[in-house]
């Protein structure tokens, strides 16, 4: 078809066209420079480094996932290998273990684990919602302090910055209190030294800091920098903070009943011991692979439930309270800087 379009017309001699006079045949087949640059710009970057980085990331994820279960998976693999080798090489009698009881036991075990994990997740999610309420109430408290407290003539009321510093100390001490740890030394920068010295003499230093803030507001009311309506509004916010703290302490001090933790772990261990015995007759040398995969899933689910049931303790899925406290501190610093033109809190 293309040859027909380029054929010589009748009555006309074939010859080079005007725009082809200065172009030789080898040069006519070369791509246009602009086209070459466009193709070069549109080419994707080399995939070698990105591919290596992706493989390394996946490898680290697999190692982290395997390490999450811990030594339980390793001992399970050894047990599976021992059962398989003993059956395939040394055992002369066949094991005719029906799979129906094993299937029913596995189904009942999954229901039990799901019920326990659902209760554990509800505790974790409630703890996260309470810390979210703590963030919101902290912003409300800072906003009310900065806007409702009256300033003396010609200067900014220093109690505003003092209350914000005390609140940063409060949330950090609360995070340590929920972990069962003493108040960190960094809090010294936010509260008076004599007040911090009482840290070891009380069983709830975070609540003492909140009580001290309420006492400061009462002094401001007596000094005429607050009226009764604004004081009541600030006190209502302090009550919201105290309610959130009480909810967190309820979760921290009331663990799941012991059977919720012990029986799922016991049943999973027994099931993992029985699985290779029931599968070795049909799977042979592939028994360790199948049994270890099944055991890994059950052990991982059990470990997740164990971590979620204690949301404030150090684990893979703990509530990131330090990060939340840093968020509250940054929010209060920004609010103070915008309202008072001050520097960092503390």
What are the residue ranges of the model-derived segments?
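Short Gly/Ser/Thr- and charged-rich N-terminal loops/segments
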Residues: 8-13, 26-29
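Transmembrane alpha-helical segments and their cytosolic interface motifs
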Residues: 68-76, 249-281
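Juxtamembrane "helix exit" motif at the C-terminal ends of alpha-helical transmembrane segments
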Residues: 79-95, 269-298, 302
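Structured inter-helical modules in multipass membrane proteins
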Residues: 144-260
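Cytosolic/matrix-facing juxtamembrane and C-terminal tails of multi-pass cellular membrane proteins
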Residues: 295-299, 304-346
């Amino acid at each position: 078809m293309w040859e027909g379009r380029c054929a010589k017309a009748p009555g006309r001699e074939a010859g080079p066209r005007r725009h082809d006079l200065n172009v030789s045949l080898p040069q006519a087949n070369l791509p246009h420079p602009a086209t070459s640059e466009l193709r070069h710009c549109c080419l994707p970057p080399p995939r070698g480094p990105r591919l290596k980085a992706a493989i390394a990331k996946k490898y680290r994820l697999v190692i982290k996932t395997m390490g999450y279960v811990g030594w339980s998976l390793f001992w399970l693999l050894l047990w599976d290998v021992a059962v398989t080798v003993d059956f395939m090489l040394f055992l002369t009698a066949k094991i005719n273990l029906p799979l129906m009881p094993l299937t029913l036991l596995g189904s009942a075990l999954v229901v039990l684990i799901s019920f326990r994990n659902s209760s554990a997740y509800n505790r974790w999610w409630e703890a996260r919602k309470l810390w979210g309420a703590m963030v919101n109430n902290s912003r409300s408290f800072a906003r009310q302090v900065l806007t409702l407290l009256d300033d003396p003539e010609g200067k900014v009321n220093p109690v505003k910055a003092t209350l914000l510093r005390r609140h940063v100390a409060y949330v950090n001490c609360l995070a340590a209190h929920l972990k069962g740890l003493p108040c960190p030394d960094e809090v010294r920068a936010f509260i008076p030294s004599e007040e911090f010295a009482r840290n070891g003499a009380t069983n709830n230093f975070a609540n003492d800091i909140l009580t001290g803030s309420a006492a400061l507001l009462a002094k401001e009311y007596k000094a005429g920098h607050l009226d009764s309506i604004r004081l009541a509004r600030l006190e209502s916010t302090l009550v919201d903070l105290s309610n959130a703290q009480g909810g967190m302490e309820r979760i921290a001090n009331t663990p799941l009943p012991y059977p919720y933790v012990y029986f799922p772990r016991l049943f999973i261990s027994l099931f993992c011991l029985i699985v290779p015995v029931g599968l070795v007759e049909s799977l042979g040398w592939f028994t360790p692979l199948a049994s270890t995969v099944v055991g890994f899933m059950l052990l991982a689910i059990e470990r997740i439930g164990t971590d979620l049931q204690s949301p404030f303790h150090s684990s893979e899925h703990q509530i990131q309270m330090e990060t939340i406290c840093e968020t509250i501190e940054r929010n209060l610093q920004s609010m103070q800087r915008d309202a008072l033109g001050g520097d960092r809190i503390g």
